[in-house]
């Protein structure tokens, strides 16, 4: 009798497991891949998505996956949406306001009564990671691959991915210069297949400051910098910040550590 019960229970659990696995697979299948959406694999030769196409895809991800939320932090210099994509587990998304409050308390010692409360907040909070892409628009790899990263986090049921999503709130800014991301892609696609295909954009890829938008982290003169500081850094005080760049086809290839504290008073240490 006991054997029959255990056997039946085992079959029931197996059926439940198969159902859950199928549901997870179905969920992943319902999130469109970058390739199915754009018509080519992101990162493939001679293919660039512009900002309009990329932001539309992020809205599709948010509609298809409960792990993804898209916020427009403001408008760029030329009126494009400046977006931040927040990715975490559905459970964390459902208590995002609570987790945000915990993060803000951890960032301000005046809001924590002592060591005991500090440890409690650390235990129930989540690690906040900010990834930014594409401040220099001719470094096309960052804004393009953001779509692949966000798709994987939105759809994958790999154990490692679920572990990350359970413990991390990812704030992803797919382009720090959406105007340039749009212009560079549009220029390339306009001349694709002609003798001018490899020609550089003939104007600055940021309307006012060109390449030097990366030098605006102390003066905050540009709208894109202001949106990033107010909507990400000051709004969340992330523990980890990863700014993605791309090397050119020539020139120096060696990076040296700073061997000194990178003191920047406008960025959390």
Describe the role of every protein-language-model region.
Residues 1-6:
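N-terminal secretory signal peptides that target proteins for export/translocation
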Residues 8-24:
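Bacterial N-terminal signal peptides
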């Amino acid at each position: 009798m006991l054997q029959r019960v255990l056997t039946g229970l085992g079959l029931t659990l197996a059926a439940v497991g198969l159902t859950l696995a199928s549901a997870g697979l179905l969920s992943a299948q319902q999130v469109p891949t970058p390739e199915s959406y754009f018509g080519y694999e992101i990162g493939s030769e001679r293919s660039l998505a512009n900002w309009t196409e990329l932001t539309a895809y992020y809205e599709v991800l948010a509609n298809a996956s409960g792990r993804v939320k898209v916020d427009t932090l403001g408008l760029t210099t030329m009126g494009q949406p400046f977006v931040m994509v927040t990715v975490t587990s559905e459970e964390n998304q459902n208590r995002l306001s609570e987790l945000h409050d915990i993060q803000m308390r951890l960032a301000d010692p005046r809001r924590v009564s002592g060591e005991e409360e500090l440890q409690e907040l650390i235990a129930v909070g989540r690690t906040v990671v900010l990834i930014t892409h594409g401040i220099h628009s001719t470094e096309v790899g960052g804004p393009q691959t953001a779509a692949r990263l966000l798709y994987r986090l939105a759809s994958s049921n790999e154990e490692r991915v679920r572990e990350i999503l359970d413990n991390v709130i990812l704030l992803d800014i797919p382009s720090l210069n959406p105007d340039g991301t749009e212009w560079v892609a549009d220029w390339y696609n306009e001349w694709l297949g002609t003798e001018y295909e490899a020609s550089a954009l003939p104007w600055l890829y940021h309307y006012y400051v060109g390449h030097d938008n990366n030098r605006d982290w102390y003066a905050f003169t540009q709208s894109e910098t202001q949106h990033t500081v107010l909507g990400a850094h000051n709004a969340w005080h992330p523990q980890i910040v990863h700014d993605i760049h791309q090397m050119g086809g020539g020139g120096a290839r060696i990076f040296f550590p700073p061997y000194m504290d990178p003191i920047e008073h406008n960025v959390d240490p």
